[in-house]
């Protein structure tokens, strides 16, 4: 079974600050026996992230609008592919991650299978509140949607373990 993982890339002012979080969550998913659609969120800088994107997508177009469009289309293609679940780390604001989340929870409206979604948010990491576009999604309205706050990376990996166990 494949899992999509998303987290802030462009919006993260210093990717190295959150790299260990993304790496730990990705390792937990893989350790539970799931394959990853792609792992670029763990890149610590632009070049490493671009290299990881290249591994996931194949050769990237040169920097510029063609690459931007290519990457956007591939991300949406992955969200709309044959995945079993999607996990998002949403502690850092990201328009791209928000679009990925929207495509994931709107899959049924696109004629695609509904999948379980997990949003992880580190309490107090970002000075502003989480967008109501994410926090406003409720389990009552979207039963497959799981929003969980955590205080430590150990707590986040524990939440993720529980989520993955429910998939089996």
Regions found by a protein language model. Name each.
Residues 1-168:
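Conserved catalytic or regulatory cores that recognize and/or transform ribose-phosphate-containing ligands
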